[in-house]
Amino acid sequence: MRDDRHMNAYRVVIVTLDRHAAGPAARVTPRLQADFPGITVDIFAAAEWGNNPAAFAECEAALREADIVIANLLFLEEHVAPIMPHLLAARERCDAFVGMITDGQIVRLTKMGDLDMSKPASAAMQLLKSLRGSKGPSAASGEKQMKMLRRLPKILRFLPGKAQDLRAWFLSMQYWLGGSDDNIEQMLRFLVSRYATGRTWAKTSAKAPIDYPDVGLYHPALRDRITTRLADLPRPAEARATVGLLVLRSYVLADDRAHYDAVIAAFEAQGLAVVPAFAGGLDGRPAIEAYFQGPHGPTVDAMVSLTGFSLVGGPAYNDSPAAVAALSALDVPYIAAHPLEFQTLAQWAASGGGLGPVETTMLIALPEIDGATNPTVFAGRHGTETCTGCARRCAGASDVRAMAPCPERIGALADKVARLATLRRSRVADRRVAIVLYGFPPNAGAVGTAAYLSVFESLHNTLLAMAAEGYDVTPPATVEDLRAAVLQGNAAQFGQPANVAAHVGADDIVARTPWLAEVEAAWGPAPGRIQSDGRGVFVLGAQFGKVMVGIQPVFGYEGDPMRLLFEKGFAPTHAFTTFYRWLREDFGADALLHFGMHGALEFMPGKQAGMGPGCWPDRLIGGLPNIYLYAANNPSEATLAKRRSNAITVTHLTPPLAQAGLYKGLLELKDSLKRWRATDPDAEELSELEGLIAEQAAAVDLGGVAPAALWIKLLETEDALIPDGLHVLGRRPDAAAMAGYLDILAGDDAEKRADYAAKLALDSEIPALLRALAGRFIAPVPGGDLIRSPDILPTGRNIHAFDPFRMPTEFALRDGAKQAQRLLEAHPTLPRSIALVLWGSDNIKSDGGPIGQALALIGARPRFDSYGRLSGADLIPLAE
C-alpha cells in the first residue's frame, strides 16, 4: 500500500487509450463508495496527452497516489515511452498492478498478490501457455480466444497458490472486455476486496462477469440495445439500399454510443436499411461473416467502419492481407469514418492541418492499406471550447467527456454512403457518369492531357467498354472524332479552348453558390473573367448519352497556378465552382471519373486530412462517388486525392522504359571527352582540349565539372531509363515494350519473366474502372516505381502510400546505406556536415530509401517495438 498523508482515500487509477470507460466508472463510483468509503476511480486517456500536456501531468500525479493501477490498450510508442517510468514507480508502491491487453512491457509489470509477471514463467504460466493453443489467422481465432478466456478462470479455480492470482488476472480481463456498468463495478469490487491492504472494509464478494455476445448487433430502438438476430433490427419499408455498419463493442457496452445513434439516424433518414454490428477482439471479420455476407453473396450494398481502426488488429497492429481477403470476398465499397480521439472537436475545427500525424496514421493510413476509402470525421469529444467547424457551434463538455456526434459531418457521411450504396444497386443503363479531363499548364495547349497517359486513346477505349457493359453512351467512331468533339465542336463560336457543353448565367451562379462571398472576395463579382463571356460561365466538354466528358477549368493564376493551391485564404474561381456544381446538380452525375494524373480538385484550399465543411475539395465534390484513374508510380499525390477528395483510385501502368541516350550538345561533349581520355597526359593539345570541354559543358549546364567526372555523368545520363511514349488503357504492351519491361524487371530469370509477362498482359485497368463505377470493392496496392516495386502489378487497384509503421524497409535501409557511402566517397575528405532534403514522394516510391540514407549518415538505425512497428531510432555504438 502507498504511504502518504491521504490515509482516508483509496485511489484506483486506470490508464488506457481512450475515455470510453469513463462513463461506467463515474456511474458506479457512488455505489462502490457505499461499501468502500473514500474510494475514487480515475480514468486517464493516453490519446489526450499529445494535445493536452496538462492531462499527462494529471495522470502522472494520480499514479503517485495510486493504490491499484489498471493499464490497458497502450500500444503506441509515444504513449508507452513517457508513461513507463511512472507506471514502474507506481508498481513498486501500489497494492496491485494489472496490465492487460496492452504492450508487452506493460503486461510484464502486472503484480497481483503472488503473481509477478516480471519474473520468469512459473508452472502456472507454462500451463497457461499450453492452454492457449496456436494463434491462427482466421476470423474464428478471436472467437476461440474469447471462449478460452471464459474457460480459464473456471479451470484455474481448482489450482492452488499463485494460480488464483493468475485467475484474478484473467477475470479482470473478462470484466474489462465486457465493459458495461455492471462489469466495471464488479471488476473494481473484485480487485479492491482481494488486494486492498490496511483497510477495515468488510469483505464483499463480486458477482461473476456478465457475458455479452462477442459478435452481435446494436440498435438504439432495440429494447435491450443488443441482439444476435438480424430479424430483430428495424428496417424501413422500402429501403433504397442496405449498409453494414461496424461499431466498437466496448463503446456499446459502456453506453458511450450517442455518436453511433446519430449515424444510424442519419443513414435511416436517407432511406437506408442499417445493420450495425460489432465484434470482440478488434477483428471485424466475424461481424462481416455473420451479418454482411450471405450464402449467395453480400447482404449489404456498402460497409462503413466507425471504429477508427484497421479492420483486423486495432491500435496494436494491422493484418491487412486478412482484411483485404475478407473485403474482396464481400465486394462492396468499404468506407472508413473515424471519431477523433487525440484532439477535441473544437481543436480539429480550428486546425489548418486537420488531423495530426498519429491520427492520420491510425485513422486513415492503416485503414487505407485495407482498401478503405472516403475517410470522414464523424465524432469526437468536446472540451471547454465551442466547436467552430460549422454554423451549429456545438458544445457540451462533461466530466466523463463522452463521444459526441458531429451532425454536419455525419450528414456528409450519410450522403456519401447513400450514393455509393445506391450506385451499386442502380441499373447500368441509368447511371450518369461525368468524366473529368484537365488542362495543365493552363493556356499551353495542354487540354486533355495527363502524366504518362494517352488520354483520348484511353478515353475512347473506356467509352467503348462502357457501351459494351450497357451504359447509355454512344462513343464517337474514332479517337480523332472523340478528340474533335471535345476540343473543337463549337469552340470557335464561343472563343473557348474546347467545345461548350453548357452556359451557366451569372444570376444562376449568384442564386446557387453557397460560398459566393468567399469566391467573390478572391475573384470579384460573378461570373468573373475566367471561362466567361461576362454574362455567365462556360462549361466545357461534350456529352455522349448519359456520359459527360467535361474539362476542369483553369486555376485562375495562369502565371503562377501553384499560388491558388498552396496559399491559404484563397478560393477557386467562379468557373471552377460552377463546373462541379453543374456536374452534380444540372447534369445529375451519379459518379465522377477523374481521368489521369492529375487534376486540381484535391489541391484546393482546406485541411490536409480530416476534411471539414470549410474545405474546398469537400465542398466541390459533395457526396459524389469519385473514381480516380492514377499512375501507379505516384502514391504520394494519389494519397492527397484519396484523403482530400474521397477518391477511389484505380492504377494504370506507366509507359515502357528506354535508355535516354544523348542529344546534340551532349553527343559533341561525349566525343570531346573520348578524345581527352585517349590523349597522352603530357600532350600539348590536352590543355586546348580541356578548354573546349569546359565550353561545351557550360553550354549544356554542366560547367565546373572535371572531365573525369563529366565522363561518368554522361555515361549515367545516356544509360538512364526514361518513359518511352504514353500508356493506353485497354492496349496490351506490344512485343518490344513487353521485352523492355521484362528485361528490367526479371533479367534472365525465366520464372519471373513468365510471372511478370502474365501480369503485364492482363487487361485489368478498364475492368477495374467499371467495377468502381458499379460500386464494387477495389483491392488496395502499395504504389511505387515499377522497377523498385514490381508488386504494383497487376494494375487496376486502389493505390495507397505505405504502412507508416514499416518504413524504411530492410531493403531501403541497405540501399540507403549504399547511397550514403557513395555520397561520402564523392568527397576527397569527410564532410563536416551534410544537408539532405527528404521528399515524401521519393521516400514513398523507394520504401524509405532516403530515410535509410539519412540514418546511415547519422550513424543510427531504426528501433522497432514489440509488434514490429517502427517506433524511433537509436545511435549505433562506436564498437559496432
Region spans (language model):
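Ligand/cofactor-recognition surfaces for anionic moieties
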Residues: M1-E880
